[in-house]
Amino acid sequence: MAKIIAFDEEARRGLEKGLNTLADAVKVTLGPKGRNVVLEKAWGAPTITNDGVTIAREIELEDPYEKIGAELVKEVAKKTDDVAGDGTTTATVLAQALVKEGLRNVAAGSNPMGIKRGIEQAVATVTEKLLESAKEVETEEQIAATAGISAADPAIGAQIAKAMYAVGGGKLNKDSVITVEESNTFGVELEVTEGMRFDKGYISGYFATDMERLEAVLEDPYILLVSGKISNIKDLLPLLEKVMQSGKPLLIIAEDVEGEALSTLVVNKIRGTFKSVAVKAPGFGDRRKAQLQDIAILTGGQVISEEVGLSLETADLPLLGQARKVVVTKDDTTIVDGAGSEEQIEGRVNQIRAEIENSDSDYDREKLNERLAKLAGGVAVLKVGAATEVELKERKHRIEDAVRNAKAAVEEGIVAGGGVALIQAAHVLDNDLDLTGDEATGVRIVRDALTAPLKQIAANAGLEPGVVADKVSRLPEGEGLNAATGEYVDLMAAGINDPVKVTRSALQNAASIAALFLTTEAVVADKPQPAGAAMPGADEMGGMGGF
């Protein structure tokens, strides 16, 4: 395909126009009085949202240079969302402010590389200041306030805080898995699963011990973990006899249990001679192996596998895991209070955390996070209902963002919200970091850009942006504008805070893209096809050429 090329000022202006188009659509959502944006869908009802990254993803521009500019800013929003789960609109507003001032200075003759170095040093200094001023999250109320701001609903914030504590057994658990599901009932309900749950139920309904609830409950059972299939009862018999002598029930988790092995277990269960339940192992392939190993570590057992030189015929009781209780339904299995050592579980948790850090796949990260939570304490489900499908989608999305926001707050702490932390951290740049020339210009660009989020919040609330920014910059640290009421208050005391991870990620990602904009000297894009252009070889009537 033929290409078109733009150079120097033309290239940068094309990129900036695309950035501005996208940023102008996104920034109207910022703050408590921000507006929503309606997104048309090819199928189904339109989506109404105030989430920056969702809006950004939907925007496709026609002009090739503008399209590239918009795509670069989408990357800012997406990266911030990936890292912190929120702050996408703040990142977009910061990127727009940095690029606008930066390009103005480049057009006036400043060296882009000098400005870039100044921006990088200024951002590093401000990030350090933000981390220093962050306060640790210590109470359920603080999490509720943070999540409530993100979800634009204090009641949802309270439910998320409750979920984080419930999954951690009364302690704050940043690794907790909180999933959001659609519900037919109106409102938001919290359902907490104690222990480890995986989505495989009993192989046969005859294993159920409670016929009314159709579930099997095993108290203080042994747990046999097998990486392959079990079909021959002769392989299993020696171990079964030892378990029967102990007087404990048995949970078998294997790739499959079939044939005479399954029928023998069922017959003994029905006769009441031996209580057991057979369950298929969760997952597939390598993921199944990993999850079996997770269960082994959680329960203090070992996976019976030929890969490690273990077989069913020679297996003994010390190789079996144990738990206080196991509940199995037709759809899932829950293991409560596994007997694994805390040290080994912590080691496994750290290993999974490292895998999450090194993974490039969103899907893999999601699955690893689920495994992490199951080992670290349990799973909470927030069930969301609404009057219409459009409202349900919007609400569910807001809650998912708020959950990630709350986790970010626990991880690195919180700072004053409402754009105040950024504008007050800008004071560390007052002496231009003792830099000179174009590098000092870069520092000043960052200092000015740090006022942009607060100005936008004020504008969306119908206030005069310049007046608000000037007043807040003079207030003591942590005090600022509550845009919902128009009053100037101690924001932390009022529960208006942001996770510092969100704030710093927004700034760092915005600065990264701004530096790319400023140092661009040429843009190469695909040449647009004329509207209704015929395919090569097609005749004027639209048929195949030559026929």
UniProtKB/Swiss-Prot annotation:
Assembly and binders: Forms a cylinder of 14 subunits composed of two heptameric rings stacked back-to-back. Interacts with the co-chaperonin GroES.
Q: What is the lineage of its organism?
A: Bacteria, Bacillati, Actinomycetota, Actinomycetes, Mycobacteriales
Q: Which family does it belong to?
A: Belongs to the chaperonin (HSP60) family.
Give the matching NCBIfam families. GroEL, PRK00013.1, PRK12849.1, PRK12850.1, PRK12851.1
Task: State a GO cellular component annotated for this protein.
Answer: cytoplasm
Q: Which SUPFAM superfamilies match?
A: GroEL apical domain-like (SSF52029), GroEL equatorial domain-like (SSF48592), GroEL-intermediate domain like (SSF54849)
| Enzyme Commission number(s) from the entry | 5.6.1.7
Q: Report the function annotation for this chain.
A: Together with its co-chaperonin GroES, plays an essential role in assisting protein folding. The GroEL-GroES system forms a nano-cage that allows encapsulation of the non-native substrate proteins and provides a physical environment optimized to promote and accelerate protein folding.
This protein's major location comes to cytoplasm
Disulfide-linked positions: none
Q: Which UniProt keywords apply?
A: ATP-binding, Chaperone, Cytoplasm, Isomerase, Nucleotide-binding
Q: What class of enzyme is it?
A: isomerase
Q: What is this protein called?
A: Chaperonin GroEL 2
**Superkingdom:** Bacteria
* Biological processes annotated in GO: protein refolding
Q: Which reaction is this enzyme known to catalyze?
A: ATP + H2O + a folded polypeptide = ADP + phosphate + an unfolded polypeptide
Q: Where in the cell is it found?
A: Cytoplasm
Q: Name one GO molecular function term.
A: ATP binding
Cited InterPro entries: Chaperonin_Cpn60_CS, Cpn60/GroEL, Cpn60/GroEL/TCP-1, GroEL-like_apical_dom_sf, GROEL-like_equatorial_sf, TCP-1-like_intermed_sf
The UniProt annotation places ATP binding at: 29-32, 86-90, 418, 482-484, 498
